[in-house]
Amino acid sequence: VLAGDLLNQCVGSAYAMRGVGAPYLGLYGACSTMAEAVSLAAMLIDGGCAETAAALTSSHYCSAERQYRFPLEYGGVRPPTAQWTVTGAGALILAAAGNGPRVTMATTGTIVDAGITDTSNMGAAMAPAAYETLRAHFADTGRTPADYDLIVTGDLGKIGHAVVTRLFADDGVELAGKYNDCGLM
C-alpha cells in the first residue's frame, strides 16, 4: 500500500493502515500524492516487486488550512486566489494482470520555483511545474494533446489553469477542449 495525506508524518494514512497488516509506504507529495502513489505502484508491479498494489490519498479542508495557510479559528478573510482543498479520499488497486485502464507510462515532474510566495495563490505557484511536467511528457513520449481524451491537473484552480494554458499557447500548443483542472470541475 502506497498512501499519503496532507498531515505531518502522514498520520492519517498511518492510522488507517495500523491494523491492516499490509506493507505500507507513506508518501508525502502534497498535491501530487496520488500521482506519486500510482506511478510508484505501477513501477513496483512492472519491476516484479509486487503483483498488486494500492494507491491511496486523502485530505481534509480544515487540516490543510491549518497546515499550509491559517487555522480557520484565525478568522482570516480568504482572498479570491485561495484554493479550496477537498475533504475526501481516493484509492486505486493496480495489478499485473486483468482488465481495465493501464498505466503505460509516467512522467515525474521537477520543482519549478517561480518566486510566488503568497500561500493563498498556490495555483500560480504550482502552474510552472505543471507546465514543465506536461511539456516534458510530450517531448519524451512524442505525443501531443491531441493524443489524449483529457489532460487534467490536480488543483491549480482558475489562475493556475490560465497560466498553464498561456504557457502552452506561447509555445504554439493549443490545449482548448483537452485540458481541465480539478480545481475548476
Stretches found by the model and what they are:
Residues 1:
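N-terminal glycine/serine-rich phosphate-binding loop of ATP-dependent small-molecule kinases
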Residues 4-8, 13-52, 59, 64, ...:
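Claisen-condensing/thiolase-fold acyl-transfer catalytic domains that form or cleave C-C bonds
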Residues 21-24, 66-77:
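Short acidic, glycine/proline-enriched helix-loop-strand junctions
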Residues 53-58, 105-107:
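Short alpha-helical "patches" and their helix-cap loops
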Residues 71-135, 140, 177-185:
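Condensing-enzyme catalytic core mediating Claisen C-C bond formation in acyl metabolism
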Residues 141-146:
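Short helix-terminating capping/connector loops at secondary-structure junctions
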